[in-house]
Amino acid sequence: METIVLGVEPRVIKKKNAEKLRKNGIVPGVIYHKGEETIAISVNELALRKLVHSAESHIIDLQFPDGKIKRSFIKDVQFHPVTDRIIHTDFQLFSAEEIIELEVPVAVSGESAGVEKGGKLLIILHALTIKGKPEDMPDHLVVDVTALEIGHSIHVKEIPLDAYTGLQIMDDPDTPVITVLASKKEAEATPEAAVATAS
C-alpha cells in the first residue's frame, strides 16, 4: 500500500474558527489513538479530497510544520449534506504491529458473462472493511466478475483472500458486493429477468 504525505497544522477547537477555516478551503479534523490525547488539526481541502476520492486506499503520513510525522489512516469523513464538500475528517494513528480496520476499495476484473448478454454491472459496495496489519493491507481488492450472470451477485463471503496474508473482511458475509442487472430491453424481452433477484 502506498504511503502519502499530507501536511497538517494544529488548531484551536472553536466553532467560529472551524467555519472560518472552511471558508478558506481548509478542513478541520482530529487525530486520535487509543490511550493518547486527541489532537485537533486542519488540512488543505483539495489535498484531502484527492485522498478521499481516490480509487485506492493509502497509509497517510501527517506532517506538522515542525517536521514531525504521525503515521495514520482516514477513519471517518463528514460531508456537507447539500454541497458534498468535506467538512470534517478523523485520522487514526497506528503502530506497525497493530491490527487495524481499514476501508479498501473494490476493483473489478474481467468481463462479466451477464454483461456480454446485455446485462448491466452494478457495484453495490465500493469499499470493504478489512482487518489486519497495516503492512498487509492492499491498495484495493480485486474481484473477478467473469462468471457473473444476469440476476446473480457476488457476496462478501465469496470474495477470496488467498492472495492476502492475515486479512479478514469485516462486512456481513451475506451482503452483495457486485451484481448484474437485466437491462430494460432485456427485462422487457424476458419477464423472468425482470423479476430475478440477486442470489
UniProtKB/Swiss-Prot annotation:
Under InterPro entries, the record lists: Rbsml_bL25/Gln-tRNA_synth_N, Ribosomal_bL25/Gln-tRNA_synth, Ribosomal_bL25_b-dom, Ribosomal_bL25_C, Ribosomal_bL25_long, Ribosomal_L25_dom, Ribosomal_uL5_bac-type
Might you name a Gene Ontology BP term for this protein? translation
MF-aspect GO terms: 5S rRNA binding; structural constituent of ribosome
Which CDD domains does this chain map to? Ribosomal_L25_TL5_CTC
Q: Does the keyword Cell wall biogenesis/degradation apply?
A: no
Q: Which domain of life is it from?
A: Bacteria
Keyword annotations: Ribonucleoprotein, Ribosomal protein, RNA-binding, rRNA-binding
- Keyword Cell membrane appears in the UniProt entry: no
Example of a GO cellular component annotation carried by this entry: cytosolic large ribosomal subunit
What PANTHER family does this protein's entry cite? RIBOSOMAL PROTEIN L25/GLN-TRNA SYNTHETASE, ANTI-CODON-BINDING DOMAIN-CONTAINING PROTEIN, RIBOSOMAL PROTEIN L25_GLN-TRNA SYNTHETASE, ANTI-CODON-BINDING DOMAIN-CONTAINING PROTEIN
Please give the subunit comment from the record.
Part of the 50S ribosomal subunit; part of the 5S rRNA/L5/L18/L25 subcomplex. Contacts the 5S rRNA. Binds to the 5S rRNA independently of L5 and L18.
* HAMAP family the record matches: Ribosomal_bL25_CTC (MF_01334)
Q: Which family does it belong to?
A: Belongs to the bacterial ribosomal protein bL25 family. CTC subfamily.
Explain the purpose of this protein. Answer: This is one of the proteins that binds to the 5S RNA in the ribosome where it forms part of the central protuberance.
Q: What is this protein called?
A: Large ribosomal subunit protein bL25
Please name the gene that encodes this protein: rplY
